[in-house]
């Protein structure tokens, strides 16, 4: 009974820590979305969303799920209290994120004309995609730093990195959108991703390791489990990312960029803002589950506890969105975005079933 109460407290503690971070991130995201809605309108939001969904799809294809699988390897190494073992796993992870990051960069750069044609129906955005290819490398390297912090249970550092990254990203984006309007979207995405990398790296370097030589053979041997498990874990995420991209690309090709912007706005309210609750909870959940994965009884108990708390938190939030949907849309965006009210109400119902 005492262990159960302690587990609930741990879940609430981690969720509160990252819940606070996510609330702050939501505020930053709301401000950014409001600025885009006012300065760039639905068209600007549509273009930004298409760029993001396209690079996310390529990233999902090339990152091999290291952002998830490597947490387990680092958590297991941490449990051994063997500094040599920990340093070896960290070294392998850092090599893998560089390799997979460059893979994403090269693939996006080479396929830029095709991506532009598929996404926008023309090749006018080829140069933009080639510039954005560098964000695939920055994002994967940032993911590697975050995995290190999460696996080593340095959750406060991870929270601080996310907080600072959100603020810096906003401060970078606003002037670019104000002065360059739609032309500022690509520079804002590139500079923001680079800033996030620098911030995450500044925190991860505080984790002390011992000098360790890791051969190419050891890198392949150690990295094989990360890549194999990561690829399997990433399949479900890849399907979700691909579906998100296909929907946006379809809307872009059959409708207009304004329609894509409206869809992005509706999805952001439920899928991103409310969905951040799941992100906050998963930050502590996965490392804890990895630590007890061999004990089916404890793993089952932890999963049930996590589901109960998810319903407890998300239920009231969804009720608020359902009641004040129209007011929320006008406040978060503008009157131009009111057609998404129906979408929000149906999405809220789906989000509840996701929590259950």
Go through each PLM region and give its residues.
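Alpha-helical transmembrane segments of multi-pass membrane transporters/permeases
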Residues: 12-25, 129-135, 148-174, 186, ...
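C-terminal transmembrane helix end/exit motif
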Residues: 2, 35, 70, 146-151, ...
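Helix-terminus/linker motif at the lipid-water interface of multi-pass membrane proteins
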Residues: 30-45, 116-119, 238-273, 288-291, ...
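Alpha-helical transmembrane segments of multi-pass membrane transport and lipid-handling proteins
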Residues: 91-120, 171, 178, 277, ...
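Alpha-helical transmembrane segments of polytopic membrane transporters and translocases
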Residues: 34-35, 46-63, 92-95, 135, ...
């Amino acid at each position: 009974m005492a262990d159960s109460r302690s587990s609930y407290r741990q879940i609430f503690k981690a969720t509160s820590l990252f819940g606070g971070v996510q609330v702050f991130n939501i505020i930053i995201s709301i401000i950014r979305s409001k600025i885009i809605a006012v300065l760039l309108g639905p068209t600007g939001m549509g273009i930004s969303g298409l760029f993001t969904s396209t690079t996310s799809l390529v990233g999902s294809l090339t990152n091999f799920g290291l952002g998830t699988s490597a947490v387990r390897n680092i958590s297991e190494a941490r449990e051994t209290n063997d500094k040599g073992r920990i340093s070896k796993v960290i070294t392998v992870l850092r090599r893998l994120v560089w390799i997979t990051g460059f893979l994403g960069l090269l693939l996006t750069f080479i396929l830029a004309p095709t991506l532009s044609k598929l996404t926008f129906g023309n090749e006018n955005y080829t140069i933009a995609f080639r510039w954005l290819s560098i964000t695939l490398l920055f994002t994967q390297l940032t993911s590697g730093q975050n995995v290190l912090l999460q696996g080593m249970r340095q959750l406060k550092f991870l929270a601080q990195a996310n907080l600072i990254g959100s603020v810096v990203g906003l401060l970078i984006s606003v002037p670019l959108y104000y002065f360059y309007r739609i032309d500022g979207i690509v520079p804002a995405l590139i500079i923001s991703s680079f800033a996030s990398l620098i911030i995450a790296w500044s925190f991860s370097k505080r984790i002390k390791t011992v000098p360790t030589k890791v051969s190419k053979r050891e890198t392949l041997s150690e990295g094989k489990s990360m890549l194999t498990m990561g690829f399997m874990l990433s399949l479900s995420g890849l399907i979700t990312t691909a579906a998100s991209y296909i929907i946006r690309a379809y809307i872009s090709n059959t409708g207009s960029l304004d329609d894509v912007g409206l869809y992005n706005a509706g999805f952001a309210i439920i899928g991103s803002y409310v969905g951040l609750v799941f992100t906050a909870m998963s930050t502590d959940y996965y490392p804890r589950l990895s630590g007890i994965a061999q004990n089916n009884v404890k793993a089952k108990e932890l999963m049930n506890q996590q589901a109960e708390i998810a319903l407890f938190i998300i239920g009231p939030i969804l009720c608020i969105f359902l009641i004040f949907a129209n007011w929320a849309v006008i406040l978060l965006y503008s009157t131009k975005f009111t057609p998404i009210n129906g979408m929000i109400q149906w999405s809220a119902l789906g989000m509840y079933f996701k929590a259950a």
